[in-house]
């Protein structure tokens, strides 16, 4: 967000050394994970490339902006990571996901419009806007997202599945196969307006 306060002419190139727990943006960039020397070597040998970023209100994001059950899972993983660093990445996301799904959820009521189209009313369990394909330590939530196509990619549910189906979809998301479900939609877009009916 700090870099985006600068004009394009003043803005320096951004390089990353991926040492996080999920490292999904690093995956999108093809960076070496948890290998500082390897990642540094990639930066030294690499070339500058323009990639897209997303913006929600006045906040920019580089990989994921999500709402619904997945956002609750992300908040839980952040809290758990602060209290205990022994579980990281995919395992942390997976165990938090199973906990929330086992508790059951009717979704989060919202209204969404994609690219100025007609409003859609949803009970959102997932509403993930992606620059690249993965989050949660490698889950391919938007498997067809590309960081340089000039578009965001969104994944959302059109219906709330029963718990066994929800658990199955969660497992399929690791390989991006959940988007083949009739109740999951993935699409590319320029912009969206999302209004949640509860805070």
Regions found by a protein language model. Name each.
Residues 1:
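Glycine-rich N-terminal segment of FAD-binding domains in flavoprotein oxidoreductases
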Residues 4-125:
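Catalytic core of DAGKc-family lipid kinases
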Residues 57-58, 149, 198:
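Residue-level signal for tight coil/turn positions that link beta-strands
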Residues 66, 70, 128-142:
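Glycine-rich phosphate/pyrophosphate-binding beta-alpha loops
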Residues 81-92, 137, 143-164:
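Gly/Ser/Thr-rich active-site loops/lids in small-molecule metabolic enzymes
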Residues 106-108, 123-125, 148-152, 190-192:
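A generic structural signal for short beta-strands and their flanking turns/coil linkers
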Residues 111-113, 128-130, 153-157:
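Short, conserved beta-strand edge motifs with alternating hydrophobic and charged residues
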Residues 114-117, 121, 146, 156-199:
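ATP/nucleoside-binding phosphotransfer catalytic cores, i.e., glycine-rich phosphate-binding loops
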């Amino acid at each position: 967000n700090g870099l985006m306060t600068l004009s394009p002419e003043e803005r320096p190139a951004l390089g990353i050394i991926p040492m996080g727990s999920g490292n999904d943006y690093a995956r999108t960039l093809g960076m070496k994970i948890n290998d500082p020397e390897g990642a540094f070597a990639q930066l030294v040998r690499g070339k500058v490339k323009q990639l897209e970023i997303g913006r929600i209100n006045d906040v920019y994001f580089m990989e994921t902006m999500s709402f619904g059950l997945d956002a609750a899972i992300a908040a839980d993983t952040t809290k758990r990571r602060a209290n205990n660093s022994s579980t990281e990445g995919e395992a942390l996301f997976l165990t938090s996901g199973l906990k929330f799904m086992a508790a059951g959820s009717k979704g989060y009521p919202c209204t969404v419009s994609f690219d100025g189209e007609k409003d859609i009313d949803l009970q959102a369990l997932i509403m993930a806007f992606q620059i690249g394909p993965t989050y949660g330590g490698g889950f391919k939530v938007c498997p067809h997202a590309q960081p340089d196509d000039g578009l965001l990619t969104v994944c959302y549910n059109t219906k709330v599945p029963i718990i066994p189906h929800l658990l199955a979809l969660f497992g399929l998301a690791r390989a991006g196969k959940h988007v083949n479900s009739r109740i999951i939609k993935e699409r590319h877009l320029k912009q969206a307006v999302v209004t949640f009916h509860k805070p």
